[in-house]
UniProtKB/Swiss-Prot annotation:
Gene3D superfamilies in UniProt: 3.30.1490.40
Organism: Drosophila melanogaster (Fruit fly)
Residues spanned by motif me31B binding motif: 341-369
Sections of the chain in a coiled coil: none
Family: Belongs to the GIGYF family.
Annotated effect of mutating residue 60 to A: In C; impairs interaction with eIF4EHP but has no effect on translational repression or induction of mRNA decay
Task performed by this protein: Key component of the 4EHP-GYF2 complex, a multiprotein complex that acts as a repressor of translation initiation. In the 4EHP-GYF2 complex, promotes translational repression and decay of mRNA targets by recruiting and bridging the association of the 4EHP complex with decapping effector proteins, such as me31B and Patr-1, and the deadenylation CCR4-NOT complex. Involved in regulating starvation-induced, developmental and physiological autophagy, which is critical for eliminating ubiquitinated proteins and dysfunctional organelles in order to maintain tissue homeostasis.
Known outcome of mutating residue 58 to A: In C; impairs interaction with eIF4EHP but has no effect on translational repression or induction of mRNA decay
Positions of region (Disordered): 100-150, 174-324, 388-443, 1036-1121, 1142-1169, 1307-1329, 1359-1430, 1507-1540
Impact noted for substituting residue 367 to A: In FF; abolishes interaction with me31B
Positions bearing Phosphoserine: 272, 291, 399, 403, 407, 1007, 1370
Stated name of the protein: GIGYF family protein Gyf
PANTHER family linked: FI03272P-RELATED, GRB10 INTERACTING GYF PROTEIN
Matches recorded under InterPro entries: GRB10-interact_GYF, GYF, GYF-like_dom_sf
Amino acid sequence: MTDSMKFGPEWLRNMSAEPSGSPSTYNVGNAAQNNSIGGHNLGNNTAASASRNLFPEYRYGREEMLSLFDRNCLLPQILPSFKKLFVEKVQCPLALTPSSEEDINQNSLGNNSRPAWLQRSPSGFGSASRGSGRGGTVDRGRMRGKSAYHPIYQRPSGLYDESLSVISKAERTWSDRNGTGDSAATTTSTSGSGALDWNGTPSSSPRKDYSNNHRNLENWRRTRNEDGSGDGPSSSGSMSGPDIAGWRSGVVGGSTNAGFGTNSHRWGRSTSWRDEDPSVDNAASLQRSISTVATLSTDRTGNNKGSGIGAAEGVGSISHPRLSSSKISQLWTVNNAAGVDADENLPEWAIENPSKLGGSFDASGAFHGDTDLKPIKSSHNTLKTKSLDSYDDVKRPKSKDLSDPDSGNDITPETSLTKDTNTTAVQEEVESSLSPISSTTTKEVIHGDISDRIKEVADEVEKLIMDDDHKISSNQSQHQNHDGFTAALPRMADIEINVKPSVTAVHRQAPSTMPIQITPTITDVAPPSHAVVSFSDHETMQHHNMHHLPQFPMIPTPHIITPNLNELWFYRDPQANVQGPFSAVEMTEWYRAGYFNENLFVRRYSDNRFRPLGELIKFCHGNMPFTHSHLLPSPIELENIPVGQIPAPLTASLSITPHKPSPIPIALSVVEQQLQQQRDEQLKANVTATAEALRAAIKGSFGGNSIGNTSHLLTMRFQMLQDQYIQHQEYQILAELSKNECFQRLSAVEQETVVRRKVQLLGLPEYLISLNGLSNSLSVLNPVAGRQLYRAVVEHAKKDQQHIFANTEQQRSVGNLLDANNFILNAQIMIQQSQQEVGPLVSSVDCIMQGGTAADLNKPNEIPRNELDLINEYNLRMLLRGQPTSTQQQPPALTNSATENLPGVDFLTETQLLERQNLMIPIWLPPNNNKQQETDQQWAEMSNADASLWETANLNEERNEDQQLLIQKSSEACFADTEKDVKIAQLFQVQSGNVVNHTALEELDQSPQNLKGSHNQKIVKSLVSDIQQNHNEELNSHQHQVKQANKQNLNTKQNAAQSALKPINNENDRKREQTEEKKRQREERKRQQLEDDKRRALNESEEQTRQIQEEKERQQQIQAQRRKALLGNVHSLSVQNGMSGTLASAQSKKNDDAKTAEPQVSSRLPSTSVAPWSFQLQNSMRSAPGLAEIQKAERRERRADQQRHQELLDKQLRANAAAAAEANDALLKWQSTPASAPVMSLAEIQAEEARRLANDLVDRQRRRELEHHQQAPLSSAVLVTSATSNIWGNANKAWSSSAAQSLSLKTSSGTGLWDEPNPLGSNGSGTSGTSSVTAAAVLAGGLNSANKSTLQAQNKSSALFASPRNLRKSQTLPALSNPEKSNKNGPGQRPEKQKLAQTRSKGAAVSIEEKDRERKLNAKSQQSSTDQAISKVNEYENEFTSWCIKSLDNMSAKVDVPTFVAFLQDLEAPYEVKDYVRIYLGDGKDSLDFAKQFLERRSKYKSLQRAQKAHNDDMCKPAPAITPSANDYADSKNKQKKIKKNKMTKMDARILGFSVTAAEGRINVGIRDYVEGP
C-alpha cells in the first residue's frame, strides 16, 4: 500500500546504511523528517538508524512535518559518513526562516523597482507569487524548492512581476549541484528559457513537478518502470501514452487509453490519483486534470506569451493553455481520465496549495481533503459540477462563448439559479460547452479554459475561503429566489459577445511583457454579487473576490475601445515640461502606483488646454478619466467650460469607491440597484460619521485648543481619520485571519506583514482619499451634514483669518494644505449659495482667504520659508496656465455680486483662490497698465464733485499721511539694504502711483554714495532726468486740477458779488448772505493758512535738502580725504605710482563734483511750483535723516576706520618683515653681498691681472733659472712653500668664490662650496685665464706686498688647475714650472713640456737667453689657444647660468638663486638634484622640467669643462684613484686614441690607470721634504 510513497529525490531514497545498498532498496524510513517534503534536506533525522530500511507506516502533511521539526535535535552519526551528501550547516525549514533583505532583493524586477507600499499586488489570501524564492540561493547548500504552498510563507508579489520572462538570477540545475541525473534529463532541463529549479519551475515549490511550464525529467519523480528503478525520459516531445510510461502511468504495452491511475499497488485504497475507468478518455476529465495542476501564482499565469502547442492525444490534440511556444513539457495529465475521486486522493505534497485543504493523512495512509465535504459529486465519467459555486456557474458558459459565440444564444445560463434546475441538464450544458475545446487551438479557447480550470482549482484547494463563498453564494441564491427574479442578470453569452471585439484591441495595447488574458472575472462583471451584511463584511468579501484576480494581469480592460486620439494623454511635469503622449493604460498604472496626484495637469490628445486631474475626475463623477474618457465632455464642450468649473452633481447616486477599473458598462438590474442602494446607505453612514468627526474636532478647537489654522486642523484631523480607518481595517482583517490555523502559527511579525499587505490591497474609499473627495461624497450622500460641516469650517476660518500660515511648518505635506484650503473655499461657497447672501459673504470670503493686509505683503522677507515655497509653486502654476487674473484690476473687497468673479461656478479657479489668499508676488502679476487711468479718473471725480480746494487738500493730506506712515515703517525696517528699498518701492507702486517717484528720488539721493565711475554717473543722471520728467508731468496734471478748482472758486465769488448788488428782499436773503460771507471768510482764512503752510513747507523742505546736501558733501569730503591719503601713500612709494595717484585723485574729484551735482538736481526738483498737497509727502521724503540713515553712516565710518587701521597694520607688518629679512641677511654673511665699493669693471680687472701675472711669471722663471744654476736645493724649498700656500689659498678662495660670484647674478658661475673657482666665470672678454675669484680677492684689499706675491702664486696655480672633482683619474701631472700651459685645447702642449723637461735635465747646456725666448714664445701660443677655449666655455657658462636664473625667476622660487644653482652644481647624483628641486621648488610640472633640463645642461657644461681641464693636476689634492669610473675610462679612452694619433708617442702612460712619472714638484704621501742647506 505504501511502497509508492517515495518522498524526496532518488539519491536520498537510495541512501542506505548498508555497505551494499542497491538502488531498488528504498531507504526512506522516517527520513521524511529528514527532508522537508520534496527535497528540502534539513540535515537532522529524528528516527533511529535501525528503522531506516522500513517503509513508512504513516504519512504526514506539510504542517504536521513543520510541527514535528525540532531545532535541538542532534545529527545522526551516520549522516556525516556520506561526504557528498552531508551538509554541515543545518538548514531549517524555509517556512520557519524569516525573510532577509537579500531574499527580498532576489524577487523579480517589478517588485524591486518600487517600494512595498506602492505595490498594488493583486494577490489574494491564497496567492503564491514569490518571484525567485529564498530556497533558490546557492549559498543555502543544495538548491531547495520555493515555498509556494501557502501565502503565509511567501513574499508578496506585485503587479509587475515577470519571474518567467525575466529570470532574475541564474540557478544551477539539480544535476550540477548534486551530481545526479542523466544526460537526457539535463538536456531536457536546459531546453527551456535558462537555468531552472530542480523540477523545472523557477518560482515554484519542488512539489510542483507537474506544473504548467518549464517541466523536465530531471526531478526525483522521473519516469520509472513498475519496480521503481526508473525507465528514463521520453524520447520525443510527444505526449502520447507510451512515451509517458512511468510509475504513475500504468502503461505497460503502450496503451494510449490507459490513465495514470491503473497501478493499484501504488496508492492503497485508490488505484491512482485519478481513480476512474481507464477506458474512458473524455475532454472534460482532461481539462479537469490540466486545471488541477494549474497554479495560482502570478509568476506563471502572468507571463504566458504565445499560444499553446497542441499535444498529441489518442484521437486528436488539445491546446494547452500554459505551454510556452519555446518549450514542450511532458504532461502527466494528458492521458488521464479523471473520475469521481479525482480530487480526493491527490496527495498533499503533490498539490499546489495543500494548506488550503486543511486535510491530512489518516492512519491507513489515505489522504482526506476538502472534497470529502463536497455536497455534490458527479458520477463515473462526468465532470463534477458545483452548483453552489457562483464563479464556475459564470465561467463555464463564458468559456463556451469564447470558443463558439454563435452557440451562446441557445444556452440558458446557470446564473438564473432557479430551484427546478436539473443537475443533469447542467452537466450536459457544461459538456457541450467544453466539447469544442478538444478540437480547436484558438486563443479564445485558451483564455476560457484557463479561467475555468483555475477557478475550479481555486475552489477545490482553498477550503476556508470557499466556505465563505458557498455561504455568500447560497445567500445570494436565496435572495434572488425569494424575490422571484429569475434570469434577471444579463446573459453572460451576450457579455462575452461584447467582449470579443475588444480582444484584438487589447492584444495591440498590452505590452510585450504582459500576457494577453481578456477573460473578465466575476468580480469584473458583477461586483455587487455578494449580499451586503455589514461594511466590514463587504470589505472582507471584496478582498476575497480579489483573491481570484492574480490569475490575470492588471490590464485595465473595462473601457476597451480601439485606440484613438482620446486614448492618448499628455501631462505637464513640475518642471513645466510636457510629457507624452501616453496611453490610458500607462497613465492608469502610474496613477495607481502613486506617481500622480490630483494636482497633475493633464489633457487628451484632442484637447487644447491642460486641466488638473482632480477636475477631470469630478467630470467623470469620481471615476478615473483615463479609463472612462467616454464620460468626459467632448473637446469642444470642454473648451467652453472654464477651468475649475464642473457640471452640477448628478441627482442619481454615484459610486464613491477608490479608483479602480470599473466593470464593463451594462444595464443594472433591479436586484443590483437594491444592492447599490444598500451599499450607498452604508457608505452614507460612514461619510456622515466622518463629517461629524471633523465638525466635532473643529468645534472643539473653539474652546482654546485651536491649532491656529483651519487648514492645518482639517489636515491633521483628516489624516487621523485615515489612520483610524486603516487601523479599523487591520483589526477586521486580523479577526478574519485569526480563524485560520495556519495564520495562528505565524509569528507576530509575519502576522503583521500579512495583515498590512491585505490592507494595502483595500485602499481608502474616496471620502477618505482627500477632503475634496469628502466634499463630493457629502454633496451626493448627505448634503445636510455637508452644510453643517461647511458652517463650522467657515466659522473657524473667520476666527483665525489673521493666522493662515502660522503653522505651515507643522503640516505634513503641501498637497494636504492645498487640499484643505480648497475645501475651506468650497465650504464658504457652499454656505454662500445656501444662504443666498452674496455680498457680505463674498467680502468675508475675500477677507478670510486674503489672510493678511497689504502691509503684510510689504514684508516678503518675513514670510516663512514654507510659505515662500507655496507662493512659488502657485506662481509657477499660474504662469504655466497662461491665464492669470490680476488682483490690481479688482478692488480689494468684492462689493458686487458673486457672479462678478464666480460666473455660475461651484468652485473657484486657482487664480481667484490666489487672489483671496494674497499669495501671488507682484512680479508674477501682469503690469498695472491702468494705474495712471485710475489716478486720472480719481482726480476727475474729485474735480467734478462740488468740493472746495481745502477739502481736496485735506483728502490728499490724509492720504499722504497714511502713505507716509507706511513708508516710514517700511524704510526703518528695511533701510539697511538698498535692494529691499527697491522691493518696497515696487510694492508701494501697486497701491499708489505717486509714491514711486518720491521713493525713487530718495533712493537716488543715496545711490551716488554707492555708484562709482563715469558710466554709472551717466546712468544715474538719465534716471534722474526721467524721474524728474515724470514728476513734472504729474505736477502739471496736479496744477491743472488746481486751476480748475480755482476757476470754480472764482466763479462762486463772482456769483456772490453779483448777488450782493441785488436788493435784499427779505431777511432770509440777508441771513443767507451773511452765512455765505462768513463761509467765504473762513475759506479765505483757510486759504491763507494753506499758503502759509505751503511757504513753511517750502522753507522746511529747502532747509532739509540743504542739510542733507551738506551732510553728503561732508561725507564726500571725508571720503576724498581718505582717498587722497591712500593715494599719497602710494605716491610715496614711487614716482610712477604717484602719477597714477594724482590721476586717481583728479578722477575722484570729478566724481565728487558729479555726485554733488546730482543731489542739487534732485534738491531743485521740489522747489518748482507744485500743488500744495504734494509737499506733505515731499517733506516726509526730505525729512531729517532718520535713525536708520544715521546708523548706516556710522557703519560706513566704522568700516572706513577699520580699513585705515588694517592698512596701518599691513604697513607695519611689511616693515617688520623687511627688518627681519635684513637681520637674517646680516646673520648669513656668507651669502650676503659685500658692501658696495668703487670697483673696476671685470674686463679691466682681468686685463690688469693678466698683465701682472705674465710679468710675474716671466720674472719668476728668470729668477728660478738663475737660482737653479746657482743652488739646486733652493728650488725645492721654493716648491715646498708654493705648495703649502696653494693648499690654504685654494680653501680661502673657495670660500670667497661664492661671495665674489654673487656680485653679479647674470655672470655667476655657480661654483660649489669646496670646488675650485671656475676660470671661465663671468669672463666676457676672455682675454686671460684668471678667474673672477682673483678679482674678488684683489678687490678685498688690505694685502701687503708679500701677501700679493703669495696670492699671485696661488692664482697662477688655481686658475690653471682643475678642481679635484673634474680631474681625471688617469691624467698625468704636468710640470709645475709651466702650469699655465695645461689647458683643455692644447694638443701641442706635450712637445712644449717635453722640451722644457729636456732643458731642465740638461741644466746649463742651454743658455738662459734661449730659454727666456722659448718661454715667451710658449706663453704667447698658450695665451692664444687658452683665450679661444676660455671664450667658448665662457659663452656656454654664461648661457647656462642665465638660463638657471631665468627659470627660477619664472617659477617664483623662494630660494637664493645663485646659491641654489651653485649647490645643485655640486651634486653628482642626478636623483639628488631632483630630490632637492622637489624639496625646494615643489612637485609641479615646472620643477620637474627644470630638474631635467638642468641635468642636461650641466652635463654639457661639465663635458666642456672637463675637456678644457683634461690635463690639469692639482698639487693641493691627493692623487686620483687607481681605478677610474666607467664614464671617465670611456672618455679617457677616446681622448687617448685621439692624442696617440696626434702625438705619435711610443706609449700613453694613462692606459695603466696611474701616473708613471710624477711631477717634479710632487710630494707623495709619507715622503718628507728635506731642504738642503747652502
